[in-house]
Amino acid sequence: MEVLLGTSALEPRSYLVTVTEHLERLGHEVRVFSAEPLPSPEELRVVGVERDLPLAPDVIYSQDAEAALLLAHLYPLTPQLFATHGDRQDVWLPPQLAGVVARVVVFDDRTGERVRAAALPQQLIRLRRPVDLDRIVARGELPDRPAKARVQLDGVSDYRRGIVQRVLADARIELDDDADLVLGRGSAVVEALAEGRAAYVYGDDGGDGWVTPERYELLEADGFSGRAEPSATTFERLRAELEDYDPALGPAGRELAQAHDARAHAQELLAAFDEVKPRRDPVDAPLRELARVVRLEAAAARRAHTHAREAESARTRATELERELAEVRERNEQLAREVEELRRQAEEAAALEEQRLERQKSRRFGPRR
């Protein structure tokens, strides 16, 4: 089978690499389409609108709305599946246009609910986030107390990141990739489980704590996003839960990761590919223009997100500077009080010295006449 993976900019990279490798292991030919011209990573065979497009792939597996629309235009009769990688950004949702995609793959129940809430009904395929258990080897026995932590918080606010840094510093835990525990969300948690490390779910919207066998189903259904339970992750809570670290979480996590085996994921994808049939008619819509609009909207959303992060960082820095300024002012006032006290003491000492000298003169020369 010839499979064309559709992307706008080769994202999400780790998923593309994992799926491509395991489909190719089974003898299938895989190319990755990138709407944006980008350098081709060694692990992927990248094609674009202007170069090396396959003549007639058997199936298209798109990872975002822009790629789905553009490839539906380029291959009007080729069946297409769509992978929804999250519920936060609209670009991850399938196009709300009948006939563009035949099936939608979701990786957690939360995202599935988001897709079902959209106007266009979709047939969903529920898979788990894959991890390459052949490539990732368990690190071995964990220590009784954690000494090193890996923090994977891409896109998390400075405030939330700061809580983690303060907690780890208070617990005397160093930052190191060769860690005993991992704090993160999504695929970072799945990889931590596969590595046999203790995994703590923590993101911008909350923290759900340690991934244990008892809580795995709840946290996996939520996509390890940190939003499974409505609770606030304060410094005090995170610091207290860090004390619940258990070295047994390592081997237990490796066992839980078996449910995310990339080999099984590839086989489930192929079964879904076999089920879809070619379109009988092309989609009657200006697909290329819609793809352009989606691309511009996604770019605007990214810029807005970047500006929001920068504004938040600026506010955080302004708060820090205000606190530092207040501390400097308080210190200056304290120093001014100390200087004033020293001046008073000096004046008193000078007055006493003058009195002493006067007494000495009186004793030596007698009273003035």
Give the residues covered by each predicted segment.
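A short, active-site helix/loop in glycosyltransferases that binds the activated sugar's phosphate group
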Residues: V91-W92, A102-Q122
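A charged, aromatic-enriched C-terminal amphipathic alpha-helix characteristic of glycosyltransferases
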Residues: A118, A228-R288
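Boundary detector for helix-to-coil junctions that initiate low-complexity/charged tails
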Residues: R279-R369
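Catalytic binding pocket for nucleotide-activated donors in carbohydrate/polymer assembly enzymes
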Residues: S187-A248
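N-terminal strand-loop element at the rim of the active site
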Residues: L5-P54
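Short His-centered aromatic/hydrophobic patch
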Residues: Y61-A67, T84
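Helix-loop-beta element that forms the nucleotide-linked donor phosphate-binding surface
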Residues: H73-L77, G112-P130, N332
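Acidic anion/phosphate-binding donor-loop and adjacent secondary structure
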Residues: V91-P95, E113-A117, P130-P146
